[in-house]
Regions:
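Extended amphipathic alpha-helical segments with heptad-repeat/coiled-coil character used for oligomerization
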Residues: 64, 69-70, 97-128
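GST-like fold's C-terminal all-alpha helical module
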Residues: 2-93, 132-252
């Protein structure tokens, strides 16, 4: 399954017949997996969660994230694979698994960055229910606060924001980045209880466009810079990205 799946994902040909053949081979392997999951009672490979699940679960999770974005093919929610979907649902209830898995965005960003795979669609929508869970928001805020200085240095070095430096002085940029990261952390903790500073373009309470531009670059960069589980759990990463999506348009 792994070999044919990644051949399908990384294939550079645009020949429709060849891609269809690879997809058919993948579906055949998934059908075999579907049958394997039916050999024992319960949703796992054997009668209870085991080493086999530990070996295969993360791999299957990556495939479920990558295939819709890079090949337009869905495993999750596909009625052709009821046992595989029951397997994913069972894994979602295991707290330890949720601590070590990647989120869908991390899986898709890594496939493109490491292997140069070319997507055929956009990133999968974030799970809004996961993003609103208080423990995920709190963890994301904590990880951001604990690593604030490292995040600022990374943004300054790699986001391109230094191009906005005035007379080569990056101190004002550093302050603006710090301000917007704090705004993000506060939103993660407080949610909608504290209004965001939106709608200031062209109004009396006018935002400094230079500072807003720095903040926009910083947040857009860090949204896709975080990696689960390296930086935080998958649930916290989802909450982090959703918070950026909410805060970013409120900068102006």
């Amino acid at each position: 399954l792994r070999e044919i799946a990644y051949k399908f994902l990384r294939e550079t040909t645009k020949d429709a017949d060849e891609l269809a053949s690879l997809q058919a081979a993948l579906v055949a392997k998934l059908d075999e997996l579907e049958q394997t999951l039916g050999k024992y009672p319960g949703p796992y490979f054997v009668s209870s969660f085991s080493l086999v699940d530990i070996m295969y679960s993360l791999h299957l999770d990556r495939l479920a994230a990558n295939l819709p974005v890079y090949r337009g093919y869905h495993i999750k929610g596909n009625p052709h694979f009821p046992r595989i979907n029951a397997y994913f649902q069972a894994l979602a209830q295991r707290r330890a698994y949720q601590r070590v898995k990647s989120d869908d965005t991390t899986n898709n960003l890594l496939l493109r960055r490491r292997w140069g795979a070319q997507p055929v669609g956009n990133l999968l929508p974030l799970d809004l229910a996961t993003s609103e869970e208080i423990q995920n928001r709190a963890e994301a805020a904590e990880r951001l606060s604990d690593n604030r200085q490292a995040a600022i240095e990374d943004i300054l070095k790699n986001s391109g924001v230094q191009a906005l430096a005035r007379n080569g002085d990056i101190s004002a940029i550093t302050q603006a980045v710090d301000f917007h990261l704090s705004l993000l952390a506060n939103y993660l903790l407080d949610g909608n209880s504290t209004p965001l500073p939106w709608g200031r373009v062209g109004g009396k309470d006018r935002v400094d466009p230079w500072e807003a531009a720095v903040g926009a670059i910083a947040l857009a960069y860090v949204r896709n810079r975080i990696c689960a589980p390296r930086d935080m759990s998958a649930g916290a990463a989802t909450a982090f990205r959703a918070a950026v999506d909410r805060v970013l348009p409120c900068i102006y």
